């Protein structure tokens, strides 16, 4: 479905109608080609993809041990069980599920939950709303993750001050707020100039993780016995109730795994996989096993083991490096939130948002002021409300486990409908993933009262907003379509009663090229004039991320006065109507911006009891429509060439 471009409401009714064996399997059918060197891409992936999961050792092992302790006492079997569980969870969830399977499910090279949703909907007849609903839930959970990640990451790093200088403990929360406010304040300047150091800093961070862990493994080398899954299984079976609660905390070691897929379009599969197998996975394991060995030999150190196992002379540098790493992790999540928000707008899941480009060279570097403001406020409120990273842990797990569960469900459809796998082949794999996902999700969902309510609350509000927008735009489209007049009939009437012809070209934007655009009807009714050349323009968003320039425009001559033009953009592309119309020159229409006027409809919406939606949802939709960014700016049309015609619509 395509969309009419209006001033206050809908813009686009979107047409979404460890080692070589693993690596070899992951790269089967590999088709990516990169101009940059592999080393550069791997380094870049360290700075963007792995910031979140790379900072998990600061708090994940600590939280898991707290959950596993019985009356504050940890047995040796508990410590080995927890670290064994972390090892096998990272192996099965990240290395097997994401590296071997999910990264293959790209949508023309792009990843992320909305890309996966668009891919699945495009493969199913009728583009079922159930898949749209699943995608909306996944996107809402991602935004919930984007709120929690900066809060828990930076807060956990600043808690290192409690070890370095206990007298600075009261300043942990204020310092965290200052760092986060600064981070969100500088977003409008762009990250291009500083992003170049993200990779090297994160590389140094992973080296520090691995080195500190390796050093302390020698405190108790027997910790390596935890590589045996026996310890994980024994931990789960000896005390199931305690183990079940601990599973929720263990999942914190997996947070950030979804970034492997979300950032697929930025780096490609090969650099992401190589960074994981060669650097990230080994360094994470060394650190987790090092923390376990340190606690086995220093039982009293379970409070903040990550910082407590650092030598005193290296504490300050480690706190500073941890702070830098968590800021980078937060930056990656913020950038991801911008990207998902843009996709949601293009897929007509959210209203139009003002999108600013912060780099002339890199089109993907964008800044969305409204998303930045709401995200920043939510993050600061979480920090002030929860005060400690341990209090945020419960909220964190629900968002990420929910997102992973959605990914698994959509992956099954990709396997059976796109890869054409037999159900007998796909189902056992998916069931295995679902068992793991459900185990983690159920272990986290029981923590609603401990802070999980924050994650659920954020996701619920966002689902409500997105579904209201989808439902409202559909009702509006159907209602206005009933009142529209077929273009054939208007042309026939004009042939009988010709209006006054004025020079120039008029472009009328519409969601249905078979109907006369509202702006055209008002122009004929009130001014009784028709331009010499008239273009009925439809903008369509494809279910793939990128549309080649050769496929951007379709032009057909309706009659001597009217021309039909369809512009198609991918959901990762920012529509630029004047530039796209310039491509029509090679199709026979000599577009000249200086002699062209763009006619847009600006609708004033009013709630109605007959809309088909509850009155409260009508009012919410109207509020969302009023806050949508201006169509002229969104589609990058010169303001001096735009004529807006207002209409009132009861929905």
UniProtKB/Swiss-Prot annotation:
What InterPro entries does the database record attribute to this sequence? K+_transporter, K_trans_C, K_trans_N, Kup
Any Pfam family from its record, for instance, is K_trans_C
Keywords, comma-separated and alphabetical = Cell inner membrane, Cell membrane, Ion transport, Membrane, Potassium, Potassium transport, Symport, Transmembrane, Transmembrane helix, Transport
Topological category with respect to the lipid bilayer: Multi-pass membrane protein
Q: Where are the transmembrane segments?
A: 41-61, 82-102, 130-150, 163-183, 194-214, 235-255, 276-296, 309-329, 366-386, 395-415, 426-446, 450-470
Q: Which domain of life is it from?
A: Bacteria
As for subcellular location, the record says: Cell inner membrane
* One GO cellular component term noted in the UniProt record for this chain: plasma membrane
The protein's GO terms of the molecular function aspect are: potassium ion transmembrane transporter activity; symporter activity
**Which family does the record claim for this protein?**
Belongs to the HAK/KUP transporter (TC 2.A.72) family.
- Provide the protein name: Probable potassium transport system protein Kup
What organism does the record attribute this protein to? Brucella ovis (strain ATCC 25840 / 63/290 / NCTC 10512)
Q: Which gene encodes it?
A: kup
